């Protein structure tokens, strides 16, 4: 019961103006990402050995579920909203960029380091117990792959002040610019065979979705449902 008591205390200390719906969406999206990645990482015994597998490959009928559990846009929209709130607060306090960035990154990186250290210990124990390297590699990937989006999000946090200034000055045109860059990247990738350029779409697409968080903060998109429609449109236009 202590955890619920602690949660109640934290809720009581939360400022009235804080958007709790944003906190709810962040928690739900992260939980779905983690659980979803764990569920698709399947393993089975073959010839007496544990063999790594992938649910979407071994059971193709489950692939349609990925359309239902597309929650990453929600996470990045919420990230944009939260970064806007944080940047506004920093501006009121006269906080420098380095101080602001250190605070934001500490909240992201500290828990990740704890996870990495804990899993390193688990992997070491598995090795000492004679577990096959392939199994250690598979379980490590299954345990840590849900953190992939943090690498992208950390880059967005670093770029957030510049992206927010672009939003304040150009509004939805800034979002359109990122979508256009994503489309041009795809054209270069498929038409000109510039494969190395394809990786940049991790930034352009999610920067565009992140801008929607700024729009939400400014009340420019109306209801959250409309926000998700915008997000879906961005994802479709920039595959």
Residue locations for each model-derived region?
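Functionally critical transmembrane alpha-helices in membrane proteins and complexes, commonly lining
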Residues: 20-86, 108-116
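Transmembrane alpha-helical segments and their boundary/interface "anchor" motifs
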Residues: 65-73, 86-123, 130-147, 151-156
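Short, Lys/Arg-rich, polar N-terminal cytosolic tail immediately upstream
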Residues: 1-21
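Membrane-interface helix-boundary motifs at transmembrane edges
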Residues: 18-19, 91-100, 163-172, 216-228
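Interfacial loop-to-helix transition and helix-capping segments at the boundaries
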Residues: 60-74, 137-152, 191-209, 223-225, ...
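Hydrophobic transmembrane alpha-helices
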Residues: 81-88, 156, 160-164, 209-218
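Alpha-helical transmembrane segments and terminal signal-anchor/GPI-anchor hydrophobic tails
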Residues: 6, 222-239
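Aromatic-anchored segments of alpha-helical transmembrane domains
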Residues: 34-38, 178-192, 232-239
């Amino acid at each position: 019961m202590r955890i619920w008591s602690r949660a109640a205390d934290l809720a009581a200390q939360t400022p009235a103006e804080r958007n709790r719906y944003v906190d709810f969406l962040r928690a739900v999206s992260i939980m779905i990402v983690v659980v979803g990645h764990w569920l698709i990482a399947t393993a089975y015994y073959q010839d007496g050995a544990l063999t790594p597998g992938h649910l979407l490959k071994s059971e193709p009928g489950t692939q349609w579920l990925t359309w239902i559990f597309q929650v990453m846009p929600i996470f990045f929209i919420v990230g944009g909203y939260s970064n806007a709130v944080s940047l506004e607060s920093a501006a009121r306090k006269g906080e420098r960029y380095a101080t602001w960035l250190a605070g934001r990154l500490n909240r992201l990186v500290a828990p990740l380091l704890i996870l990495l250290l804990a899993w390193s210990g688990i992997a070491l124990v598995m090795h000492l117990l004679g577990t096959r390297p392939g199994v250690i590699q598979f379980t490590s990937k299954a345990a840590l792959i849900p953190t992939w989006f943090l690498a992208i999000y950390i880059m967005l946090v670093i770029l957030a002040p510049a992206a927010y200034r672009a939003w304040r000055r150009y509004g939805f045109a800034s979002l359109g610019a990122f979508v256009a860059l994503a489309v041009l990247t795809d054209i270069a990738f498929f038409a000109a065979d510039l494969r190395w350029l394809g990786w940049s779409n991790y930034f352009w697409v999610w920067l565009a979705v992140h801008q929607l968080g700024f729009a939400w903060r400014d009340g420019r998109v109306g209801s959250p449902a409309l926000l998700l429609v915008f997000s879906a449109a961005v994802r479709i236009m920039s595959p």
